[in-house]
Regions:
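Short, mixed-charge aromatic SLiMs
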Residues: 105-115, 300-304, 352-360
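Low-acidity, Ser/Thr- and Arg-rich intrinsically disordered low-complexity segments
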Residues: 2-17, 26-28, 33
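Alpha-helix initiation and N-capping motif
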Residues: 114, 139, 162-165, 177, ...
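Cationic, low-complexity basic patches in intrinsically disordered or flexible, solvent-exposed regions
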Residues: 20-21
């Protein structure tokens, strides 16, 4: 089986993909930003032509990390840890940070919560270099990407409901979503016509085990090491647009990371299972693959994952308790092993302590206490 691997050698080049993707359509000026990104010069889908390739090796382009919070509630300590690791990793490599507000879902379209997120990041001292950008302003780019996939015959309408998927007792992918077995992949015209009485979702075809090509995705995570997933058996055809018209997370983040020149994605290990799908989309759309680094989750003493819904150690409570960002970050650094003790430290002061070797020691989730 042919494998698609995350790039290992990079050279600086100009990311002109947003203009290529848009074709002759009208695209908002903010979306069409030419950003310097690192791309694998040996990748088969490099976005520039061979004539544009440099004749001499180019210096590695600067690291570009990102914050990508969803304004669905106040940040909790786990969100702070994720943003802190992304910031420290980029800054320790002399890189920059892009802030993107992921507000595609209606429940996330709350300007007051987005404003609170921005205020909390500023209070923590986790400054960013570009943004904030809002996904609800970037729908034209997602539509263009989906159109390319449709024109290539890679998508199909899916009329399955959640209840039907769960009733089928399908096994689940690593992120908890049912592995789709292709019930709507080859509908007859008559069945499709009858099913169209309700709005369909849109699914992306993945190679079947019989295709003998591009079925296996491999990449190396900075924390969890070598990863491998057979799309057909461990994932199945996946959503790129929901039945309510909302673009799926997998498509939106791939489009945004490429357009914003992101070269390093740092996020919680609960999203590790999403990475093969995103790499597959990058391959289909001819986009660069960033480096991925997934970090352990922070857990409450009773073993639960911290959540916005339960208001576990939310930042409002933490700001009131610790008083200063230095006190909070110093305590968090001690809890997670980034720095010794609980000495108050600013984000800038933690840069010298940060190491991915330390994060790798905590592959298991980390239990934190409010003490």
């Amino acid at each position: 089986l042919t494998t698609i691997k995350a790039p290992s050698r990079w050279s600086g080049t100009r990311n002109v993909w947003p203009q290529q993707l848009a074709g002759h359509g009208s695209v908002s000026p903010t979306a069409l930003r030419a950003i310097l990104v690192r791309m694998d010069i040996n990748a088969r889908n490099i976005a520039t032509t061979a004539a544009d390739a440099p004749t001499t090796p180019a210096a590695p382009a600067p690291v570009v990390g990102r914050f990508a919070p969803s304004p669905s509630g106040r940040m909790h300590l786990g969100n702070v840890f994720s943003c802190l690791c992304a910031w420290l990793s980029a800054r320790s490599q002399g890189g920059s940070i892009v802030l993107r507000i992921e507000d595609l879902d209606d429940r996330c379209k709350r300007p007051e919560l987005a404003a609170q997120l921005i205020d909390d990041l500023a209070w923590l001292g986790l400054e960013w270099d570009e943004g904030p950008y809002y996904q609800h302003d970037r729908l034209d780019l997602y539509e263009s990407a989906l159109r390319r996939l449709k024109d290539a015959g890679l998508t199909y309408p899916c009329f399955c409901t959640r209840a039907e998927l769960h009733a089928a007792s399908a096994p689940h992918a690593s992120d908890g979503t049912p592995i789709y077995r292709g019930a709507c992949r080859s509908l007859s015209a008559e069945v499709a016509r009858r099913s169209a009485l309700r709005a369909p979702a849109t699914r992306l075809r993945v190679p079947t085990v019989d295709d003998l090509a591009d079925d296996v995705i491999e990449f190396v995570d900075r924390t969890y090491g070598a990863q491998c997933e057979a799309l057909a058996t461990e994932c199945g055809d996946f959503l790129v647009r929901r039945s309510d018209g909302v673009f799926a997370y997998q498509l939106a983040v791939v489009v945004d990371d490429a357009a914003m020149g992101v070269t390093e994605v740092v996020r919680g290990c609960d999203l590790l299972g999403s990475t093969p799908r995103q790499i597959y989309l990058q391959h289909l759309l001819g986009l660069p693959t960033p480096h991925y680094a997934h970090i352990p989750l922070l857990m409450a003493p009773d073993g639960r994952r911290l959540s916005k819904r339960d208001r576990d150690l939310d930042l409002g409570e933490l700001r009131a308790r610790f008083g200063t960002p230095e006190a909070l970050l110093g305590w968090l650094a001690g809890q997670t092993g980034i720095a010794p003790g609980t000495t108050p430290r600013s984000a800038e002061q933690l840069v010298e302590h940060f190491s991915w070797d330390v994060i790798r020691k905590h592959r298991e989730n980390i239990t934190v206490t409010a003490e």
